[in-house]
A protein has these predicted regions:
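N-terminal capping segment at the start of a domain
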Residues: 2-35
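Predominant activation on well-ordered alpha-helical scaffold segments within soluble catalytic domains
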Residues: 12-16, 46, 98-102
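A non-catalytic alpha/beta surface segment that caps or lines the substrate-entry region
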Residues: 23-69
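Proline/glycine-enriched tight loop/beta-turn segments at coil->beta junctions
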Residues: 71-76
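Alpha-helical metal-binding/catalytic segments enriched in His/Glu/Asp
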Residues: 79, 89-103
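Histidine-centered divalent metal-coordination motifs
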Residues: 82
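Glycine-rich phosphate/pyrophosphate-binding beta-alpha loops
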Residues: 85
Length: 103
C-alpha cells in the first residue's frame, strides 16, 4: 500500500471514530460542549496526542493541549480546533481541524 493510501485510510478512520461520538438524543452530529460525548471526544484527542509522543494534557478550561518540544529558540507551529459541535452540527464540525492537527 502506498503512503498516500495509508494516510487516507488513517484520516478517514480518525474522522469516522470521532464522528461516532455523538448524542443519540440530538439531531445531526451533536457533541455539545461540556456534555458526556464532548468529554469523550476530548479524551479521544488526548489519547491520540499521547500516541504520537506529545506531552498532552487537558487544562482547567477543558482544552486539550499537545506539545512536541523542538529546538530551543526554534520557530513554533500552533494549530487549533474544537471537538464539540453546535447542536445538530454537521459531521465535520470541528473534526477536520482536530484530525488535521493530529495528522
Amino acid at each position: 500500500m502506498d503512503a498516500a493510501r495509508m494516510i487516507e485510510e488513517r484520516v478517514g478512520g480518525d474522522i469516522a471514530e470521532l464522528a461516532s461520538m455523538v448524542d443519540p438524543d440530538q439531531e445531526g452530529w451533536s457533541r455539545v460542549a461540556l456534555t458526556e460525548v464532548d468529554v469523550e471526544g476530548r479524551q479521544w484527542a488526548l489519547k491520540q496526542f499521547r500516541r504520537l509522543g506529545l506531552d498532552a494534557r487537558i487544562d482547567p478550561a477543558g482544552n486539550v493541549i499537545g506539545c512536541l518540544q523542538g529546538a530551543i529558540g526554534g520557530r513554533s507551529i500552533m494549530v487549533g480546533s474544537h471537538v464539540d459541535t453546535v447542536p445538530g452540527g454537521g459531521r465535520f464540525d470541528g473534526i477536520v481541524g482536530v484530525v488535521g492537527a493530529i495528522e
